[in-house]
Amino acid sequence: IPEKVKINDSTFVAGDNFLLKNKQGQWELYVEGNPLQIGKITGSLTQELMQKQEAIFFNKVEDLVPSKTQQYLLRKFLAWYNRKIYLHIPEEYKAEIYGLSQFSSSNFSEIGEPYLRLLYLHGAHDIGHAMQDLMLVGCSSFAVWGDKTEDGELLIGRNFDFYAGDDFAKEKIIAFVNPSEGHKFMSVTWGGMMGVVSGMNDQGLTVTINAGKSEIPLVAKTPISIVTREILQYASTIEEAVAIAKKREVFVSEAIFVG
């Protein structure tokens, strides 16, 4: 992969790929290549942001579960619960997560090796949702068109209400991804996350996810953000999006809002 070059504190380049802070103070990422390249280049460019999010997330878990014994039991439970998650994630996305994990923090080895830790983190939203029906994850969105918008075209808005603390919400990344297979797409994400919670592809298809009421599942399956990523990358119509969603077994109820 191309080497990362630091231009200044808010601009990093690796070949044709880059990470920069725009005028609005938001991080923008452009990355291209095959799954492993996309993972490694994204990891290289966003390493600081990724390690920061990981620390914030695991510190938040420590706040919620301060007892060392309970933390140990939680780790054992999650390892058991996620034992089959790898069977439900497409190979290309496992390759991308593996590439990303090469740039993970070395501080959380007691939770798991970097690749497994990142795999689990992609299911954290789903597990949290299932365990508490956490309205920690109750996102809201709307769509208007016709005489409700200025130009009559479709307008979709959403609130991203997955709340893991103010610090976690600070460093969002607007990622533009040009994969070797499928459609180019953009999504609003954060360091270490290759799944999609809100995004749009170059076919004009948009997806957002909104939590629904769930039964507690017995074993982890496909994280919802991986399903929405697959939809953005491979669907150009609502029918194709529905077909992709139907072929995946997810482990919590979510409404996937496709426009």
Show the residue positions of the predicted features.
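N-terminal mature-domain region immediately after signal-peptide cleavage
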Residues: I1-E239
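Short, well-structured alpha-helical segments that form the helix of a local strand-helix-strand
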Residues: I238-E249
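Short arginine-rich
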Residues: E249-I256
